[in-house]
């Protein structure tokens, strides 16, 4: 089953976006209609307004749905975050840097020799692996979007750009750690000579310009559930690219991917710890938030990926990742099972409302439902031949989905 079947948005429709935003402390909601005005429909594709629209539809979005009393929870957690969350960050002086894995440019002979070694090691690695590695790198390079999105979360966002709130410190320092991932993969891929860097760079620019449809609703419950899921997903993905790099004989690339995976695991632990604390303080609100996010579907952060050519680029990248075993629908179900165990969702008892109990029942049966869907999808896939798609990232060569 393609990861995209579970994690992507429907194709973009040409219509105004509608954003629904409840006023804090009141039940009515505001509906803000946002549209791009064009004077000549025949030139629609050339209008600046549409030129920067995401290639996929960003559905109607709710904003600021968390009530004030829930925001107070995050204020009360600041001492906890200072003591329990920030220690998951590494001091800069103790952290690895991309240059630790790359040829040193100050010595001409050594630099050129090491670049030749990289190109020799990677020349026989198949295109499908590079498609997935590039997709992973592009996802990491869209980091400005992720920091921006975290700073939309009420109660924890960096209000000034330099706030000393532990939540704001975490967001900035987490971003700084993550920044090394895309930087390192980008430089290594450039040195291999195996990918079309201009098309890769275009994809990064398109993706950052498109943003992401997070479905957070400015709600930190939703935001931290999402990041818990995504950090585990990236841990799995980078771990599998490390394993495949070893199989293909590139020990350095395996070490790069493994090092990034270790960072993602540490970040996963931190985010799951936040949600674990929320389940302790507010089990009813937490289980409802988790069920809500799963019903809306946890979409991958790069689901608006586009290279200027392929309108279904993310779906195609996801299909290749599924086929070569880097990230699969089974992983998606496995992550949910892991988080349900980690947060002890099945054993929640006292303190749940009727809606909370219904959310609990839904969540506890969801992994098996996902697995059954995967099995049926896999059975259907076996009956049809797998198509190939041209990827601009590998100079337009066809890669099997």
Curated annotation (Swiss-Prot):
GO terms for cellular component: chloroplast. Its cofactor is Fe(2+). It catalyses: octadecanoyl-[ACP] + 2 reduced [2Fe-2S]-[ferredoxin] + O2 + 2 H(+) = (9Z)-octadecenoyl-[ACP] + 2 oxidized [2Fe-2S]-[ferredoxin] + 2 H2O. Its EC number is 1.14.19.2. Fe cation 2 binds at residues 178, 231, 264, 267. The lineage of its organism: Eukaryota, Viridiplantae, Streptophyta, Embryophyta, Tracheophyta. The gene is S-ACP-DES3. Pathway: Lipid metabolism; fatty acid metabolism. Homodimer. This is Stearoyl-[acyl-carrier-protein] 9-desaturase 3, chloroplastic. It holds the Pfam family FA_desaturase_2. Keywords: Chloroplast, Fatty acid biosynthesis, Fatty acid metabolism, Iron, Lipid biosynthesis, Lipid metabolism, Metal-binding, Oxidoreductase, Plastid, Transit peptide. The record marks 216 as: Confers substrate specificity. Gene3D superfamilies: Ribonucleotide Reductase, subunit A. It is found in: Plastid, Chloroplast. GO terms for molecular function: metal ion binding; stearoyl-[ACP] desaturase activity.
């Amino acid at each position: 089953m393609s990861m995209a079947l579970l994690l992507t948005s429907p194709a973009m429709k040409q219509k105004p976006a509608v954003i629904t935003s409840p006023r804090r402390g009141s039940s009515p909601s505001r509906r803000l209609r946002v549209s791009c005005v064009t004077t000549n429909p025949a030139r629609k594709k050339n209008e600046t307004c549409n030129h920067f629209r995401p290639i996929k539809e960003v559905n109607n979005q709710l904003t600021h749905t968390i009530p004030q009393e829930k925001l107070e929870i995050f204020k009360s957690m600041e001492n906890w975050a200072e003591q329990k969350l920030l220690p998951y960050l590494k001091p800069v002086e103790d952290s690895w840097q991309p240059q630790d894995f790359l040829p040193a440019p100050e010595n001409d002979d050594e630099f050129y020799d090491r670049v030749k070694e990289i190109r020799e090691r990677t020349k026989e690695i198949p295109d499908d692996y590079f498609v997935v590695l590039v997709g992973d790198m592009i996802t990491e390079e869209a980091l400005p979007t992720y920091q921006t999105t975290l700073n939309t979360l009420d109660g924890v966002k960096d209000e000034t750009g330099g706030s000393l709130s532990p939540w704001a410190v975490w967001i900035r320092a987490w971003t700084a750690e993550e920044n090394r991932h895309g930087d390192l993969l980008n430089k290594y891929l450039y040195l291999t000579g195996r990918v079309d860097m201009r098309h890769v760079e275009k994809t990064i620019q398109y993706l950052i310009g498109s943003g992401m449809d997070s479905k957070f609703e400015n709600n930190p419950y939703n935001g931290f559930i999402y990041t818990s899921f995504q950090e585990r997903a990236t841990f799995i993905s980078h771990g599998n690219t490390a394993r495949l790099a070893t199989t293909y004989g590139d020990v350095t690339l395996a070490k790069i991917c493994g090092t990034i995976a270790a960072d993602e695991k540490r970040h996963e632990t931190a985010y799951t710890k936040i949600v674990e604390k929320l389940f302790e303080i507010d089990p009813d609100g937490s289980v409802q938030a988790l069920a809500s996010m799963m019903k809306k579907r946890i979409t991958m952060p790069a689901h608006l990926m586009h290279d200027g050519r392929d309108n279904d680029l993310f779906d195609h990248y996801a299909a290749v990742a599924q086929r070569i075993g880097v990230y699969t629908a089974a992983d998606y179900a496995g992550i949910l099972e892991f988080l349900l165990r980690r947060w002890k969702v099945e054993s929640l008892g006292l303190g749940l409302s009727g809606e909370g109990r219904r959310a609990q029942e839904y969540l506890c049966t969801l992994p098996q439902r996902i697995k059954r869907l995967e099995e049926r999808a896999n059975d259907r896939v076996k009956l049809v031949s797998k198509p190939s798609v041209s990827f601009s990232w590998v100079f337009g060569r066809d890669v099997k989905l």
